[in-house]
């Protein structure tokens, strides 16, 4: 009987300890914002805050026209950079000011900035999430693109 009680107490404790923490909502794939960025600091293992980000679109003349900018928040994210009306089919560039970020931490980085150039498709509302993983001498990017939403 004593071992059965101990087993039940242990199981109850495990259930309590494995309960997931509540999700803090700071954006989702269902957001009306068609473009979101997320930046992580691979050295410190946390979101990269206060990184300046510029978004540009290739013009018909072949040059980049900046149309949005911002700084990453406490989660390393920027939401609502643009609207569906502005974010039409075309070639886009997201520029991360990585040099200023590392220099503010007392690190001399190799890269001045990191660019992600991609094509956006207007076949319905899509949500683009551009993620960057940074270190002073390298960076990696990835994208998540939702299916078109009508």
Swiss-Prot record:
- What range does the record give for the signal peptide? 1-20
Q: Which residues bind L-thyroxine?
A: 38, 77, 140
**CDD domains with a match to the protein in the record:** TLP_Transthyretin
Expressed, tissue-wise, as follows: Detected in choroid plexus (at protein level). Detected in choroid plexus.
Mind telling me how this protein is modified after translation? Sulfonation of the reactive cysteine Cys-33 enhances the stability of the native conformation of TTR, avoiding misassembly of the protein leading to amyloid formation.
What GO CC terms are in its UniProt record? extracellular space
Keyword Zinc included in the entry's annotation: no
Please provide the Gene Ontology terms (biological process) for this protein. Answer: purine nucleobase metabolic process
Question: What is the documented function of this protein?
Answer: Thyroid hormone-binding protein. Probably transports thyroxine from the bloodstream to the brain.
According to the record's subunit comment, the protein's assembly and interactions are: Homotetramer. Dimer of dimers. In the homotetramer, subunits assemble around a central channel that can accommodate two ligand molecules. Interacts with RBP4.
For this chain, the family text in UniProt reads: Belongs to the transthyretin family.
- How is this protein named in the record? Transthyretin
Underlying gene: TTR
